């Protein structure tokens, strides 16, 4: 049975998926799901949303957690959150608890947050500061570089401390962003990181702090959260607060861009050039992009009135009129950097229909709450926008769960960013599913 959306009746896409699972030559359910998922990806209709199982099936979710979230570089936090030796942050990536900690000479380490004794989590708080990493269960004690220092009582004469250090996780950072990858061989990212460093150099990311943080759980698949972010087709009807400052166009390459917008961009780019801040659009495939775009003329910050949220500007920026430096990192982050503050977003799947969205507002390290900025005022635009997006994603999920759902067409004019994301997702998943397929085939002797 074909899985192409143009052939399968909408009400039977899940049936087709189940048929492939049932007829797979392998007994392992995840291997069977792999074959069925790869087949759906090969036959999916371009410029359309994905078939229903990609948004609600636990087996597809398990596959994409393995092939994407346990493989890609994921944004997990900011270096300013672990400023000194012993500072740590934790993050949950699927079933995998991870700890990122600052060690000697400022070195940043990442480990599986799992004791090598009996598997208990070491650090249970989101953030903290410790002299050593100590398991709360039996007090096994680790150095900040992961070496096991103490293993309790009577482990036997042959017990080897050196063989029981914490299991490391790949970690890197640039422009104040922390990224981890659970893969043994993470994908190449150096070009993007170098550009991230260059574009954020004027913001002096060693001198920022988190002024506010929000964590909300959306009852929607993580891809719906990202899809919603990758277009502003919905903005006029959903985001009055955001449109006080944001211009919907993504860049001058946006097919909707008007001559007036291109003129504004040209004037702003001349201003940014004079201020010596990078602005040119940079793409790294469909996974990463950076671009500086103007806001509504006369607006300098994403606030309710367009005025700065912080009187202390970021880094060495000479004035607040810096537009919005937009940074996209798939699969789990989008960001806006303005002259006075920045807003960074992190997306982490919790289940097939549940996603954690974390928002952090950054200001200059020396900005004083109550003097230079009011965190509640700073948050208003994106608190409202994120909640509106939550409602949109959740209603999208409810509709997709219906037997009436079938993949719908994207607009190349308004939803080109969604097309890019879904294409990136599909290509990435398919290449990795195909790459591992031979090792799972049963060979008859």
UniProtKB/Swiss-Prot annotation:
Q: What does this protein do?
A: Involved in degradation of glycine betaine. Part of a Rieske-type oxygenase system that catalyzes the conversion of glycine betaine (GB) to dimethylglycine (DMG). This subunit is the terminal oxygenase component of the system. Is specific for GB, and does not show any activity on choline, L-carnitine, stachydrine, dimethylglycine or sarcosine. Activity is strictly dependent on NADH.
What is the protein named?
Answer: Glycine betaine monooxygenase oxygenase subunit
Entry note: thermal dependence: Optimum temperature is 30 degrees Celsius.
Q: Which InterPro entries does the entry mention?
A: Rieske_2Fe-2S, Rieske_2Fe-2S_sf, Ring_hydroxy_dOase_asu_C_dom, Rng_hydr_dOase-A
Q: What is its EC number?
A: 1.14.13.251
Biophysicochemical property: pH dependence: Optimum pH is 7.5.
Give the source species: Chromohalobacter salexigens (strain ATCC BAA-138 / DSM 3043 / CIP 106854 / NCIMB 13768 / 1H11)
Per UniProt, [2Fe-2S] cluster binds at: 115, 117, 135, 138
Task: Keywords in alphabetical order, please.
Answer: 2Fe-2S, Iron, Iron-sulfur, Metal-binding, Monooxygenase, NAD, Oxidoreductase
Gene3D superfamilies reported in the protein's UniProt record: Naphthalene 1,2-dioxygenase Alpha Subunit, Chain A, domain 1, Rieske [2Fe-2S] iron-sulphur domain
Reactions accelerated catalytically: glycine betaine + NADH + O2 + H(+) = N,N-dimethylglycine + formaldehyde + NAD(+) + H2O
Upper classification of the organism: Bacteria, Pseudomonadati, Pseudomonadota, Gammaproteobacteria, Oceanospirillales
Subunit details: Homotrimer. The system is composed of an oxygenase subunit (BmoA) and a reductase subunit (BmoB). Maximal specific activity is obtained when the ratio of BmoA to BmoB is 5:1.
Q: Which GO terms describe its molecular function?
A: 2 iron, 2 sulfur cluster binding; iron ion binding; monooxygenase activity
Q: Which cofactor does it need?
A: [2Fe-2S] cluster; Fe cation
- The kind of enzyme this is, by top-level EC class, is oxidoreductase
Q: Which residues form the Rieske domain?
A: 73-180
Q: Which family does it belong to?
A: Belongs to the bacterial ring-hydroxylating dioxygenase alpha subunit family.
């Amino acid at each position: 049975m074909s899985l192409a959306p143009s052939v399968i009746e909408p009400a039977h896409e899940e049936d087709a998926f189940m048929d492939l699972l049932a007829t797979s030559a392998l007994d392992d359910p995840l291997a069977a799901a792999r074959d069925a998922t790869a087949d759906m990806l090969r036959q999916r209709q371009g410029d359309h949303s994905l078939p229903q199982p990609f948004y609600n099936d636990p087996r597809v979710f398990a596959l994409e957690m393995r092939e994407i979230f346990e493989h890609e570089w994921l944004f997990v936090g900011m270096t300013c959150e672990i400023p000194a030796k012993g500072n740590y942050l934790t993050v949950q990536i699927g079933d995998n608890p991870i700890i990122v900690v600052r060690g000697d000479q400022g070195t940043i380490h990442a480990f599986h947050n799992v004791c090598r004794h009996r598997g208990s989590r070491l650090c249970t708080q989101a953030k903290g500061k410790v002299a050593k990493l100590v398991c709360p269960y039996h007090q096994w004690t680790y150095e900040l570089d992961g070496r096991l220092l103490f293993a309790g009582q009577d482990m036997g004469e042959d017990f080897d401390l050196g063989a029981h250090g914490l299991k490391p996780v790949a970690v890197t950072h640039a422009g104040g962003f922390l990224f981890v990858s659970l893969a043994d061989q993470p994908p190449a990212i150096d070009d993007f990181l170098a550009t991230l460093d260059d574009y954020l150099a004027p913001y002096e990311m060693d001198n920022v702090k988190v002024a506010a943080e929000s964590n909300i759980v959306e009852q929607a698949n993580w891809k719906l959260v990202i899809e919603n972010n990758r277009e502003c087709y919905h903005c006029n009807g959903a985001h009055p607060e955001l449109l006080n400052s944001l211009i919907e166009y993504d860049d001058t390459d946006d097919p909707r861009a008007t001559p007036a917008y291109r003129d504004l961009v040209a004037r702003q780019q001349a201003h940014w050039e004079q201020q010596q801040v990078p602005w040119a659009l940079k793409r790294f495939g469909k996974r990463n992009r950076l671009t500086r775009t103007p806001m509504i003329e006369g607006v300098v910050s994403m606030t309710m009135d367009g005025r700065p949220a912080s009187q202390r500007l970021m880094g060495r920026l000479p004035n607040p009129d810096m537009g919005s430096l937009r940074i996209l990192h798939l699969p789990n982050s989008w960001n806006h950097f303005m002259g006075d503050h920045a807003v960074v977003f992190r997306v982490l799947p919790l289940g097939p229909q549940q996603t954690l969205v974390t928002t952090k507002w950054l200001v200059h390290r020396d900005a004083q709450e109550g003097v230079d900025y009011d965190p509640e005022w700073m948050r208003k635009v994106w608190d409202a926008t994120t909640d509106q997006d939550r409602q949109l994603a959740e209603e999208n999920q409810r509709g997709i769960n219906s037997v009436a759902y079938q993949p719908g067409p994207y607009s190349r004019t308004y939803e080109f960013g969604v097309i890019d994301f879904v294409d990136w997702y599909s290509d990435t998943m398919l290449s990795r599913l195909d790459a591992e397929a031979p090792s799972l085939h049963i060979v008859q002797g």
